[in-house]
């Protein structure tokens, strides 16, 4: 089963593949999937 792993600066990997083209991504609570967020939201969260 794939798992979402959060990297720095709003990047995630999903089973070894970058989510959301590697940017603007957060993992769900249990790391079961990744959610793509627009860059503006990421900047608002201080993750961009």
Swiss-Prot record:
Alphabetized Gene3D superfamilies for the sequence: 4.10.40.10
Classification via InterPro entries: Spidertoxin
Broad class of where this protein is predominantly found: secreted
Keywords in alphabetical order: Calcium channel impairing toxin, Disulfide bond, Ion channel impairing toxin, Knottin, Neurotoxin, Presynaptic neurotoxin, Secreted, Toxin, Voltage-gated calcium channel impairing toxin
Domain of life of the native organism: Eukaryota
More about this protein: This toxin is a diagnostic ligand for P-type channels Ca2.1/CACNA1A in the mammalian brain.
Family (UniProt): Belongs to the neurotoxin 02 (plectoxin) family. 03 (omega-agtx) subfamily.
Free-text domain note: The presence of a 'disulfide through disulfide knot' structurally defines this protein as a knottin.
Protein's UniProt name: Omega-agatoxin-Aa4a
Organism (species): Agelenopsis aperta (North American funnel-web spider)
